[in-house]
Amino acid sequence: MSETVLSSATREVTLGFDRSFVPIGERINPTGRKLLAKEMKEGDFSRVESDAVAQVEAGARMLDVNAGIPLADEPGIMAKAIQLVQSVVDVPLCIDSSIVAALEAGLSVYKGKALLNSVTGEEERLESVLPLVKKYGAAVVAISNDDTGISQDINVRFEVARKIVERAADHGIPASDVVVDPLVMPIGAIGAAGRQVMDLVRRLRSELKVNTICGASNVSFGLPNRNGLNGAFISMAIAAGMTSAIVNPLHTEIMTAIRGADVIMGNDKECANWIRAYRELPAGAEDRRARRGRRRRQATA
């Protein structure tokens, strides 16, 4: 059994096979959010702050922080965003960038043990990211593609994941600090994408004994009622053994699916999390919770 321990300055979160699923809030990401990108580029992090607080209140146990803004000082923005987020919430963070300098900028100011997002099987990426993971004592997301791109063959993706785990070991990084992303593809374009991910998660768990992560909303791209489909997918992924995912926790359907799957899989001891989230609500409170969620989404749009 593999456990990945991540931390902020004051709180630990553990990814593990028999532990509650870890939802990672996705909203601190300027991609596709023009106003957020403009504000972050100009040094206004008020929306970052409100997004951070709202996601944790909604049930996110970690937050992903991305500062990818074209023609901007991404390392500088990343460092400021990490410091700001850590000042307003106490959950561990996932530092997310395709630029190595931005990853190191975030790591250099981070308090705790971060999850670095990400490394691939590409040689250049392996040799630039893994030394950072070791230097700062972080964990890392391993994405199952390499120099040849994303394979539709899950056996190829498995071998890429194995390669990354082995190369991490060469750098003194244990398999417990490698969290594999099996790559969720849009099911509207690739009909077998969901089944492939489930099969690959089971194999990663049984053979490599690593924790797993994904961008859950990728599965529903281009389809109607995306939240309903995302919730169905995440429930099945948890049943297959996935231990974390980057999601939008402001969508109540997603959080209900996650909490429910944890109960059904026996990973919510005595149903404590489910009871805390729902039983104590008085009549009508569930509707009010949904309305608050809608207001939070509108406020942070």
Model regions: which residues?
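Domain-level signal for soluble alpha/beta catalytic cores
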Residues: 1-179, 185-301
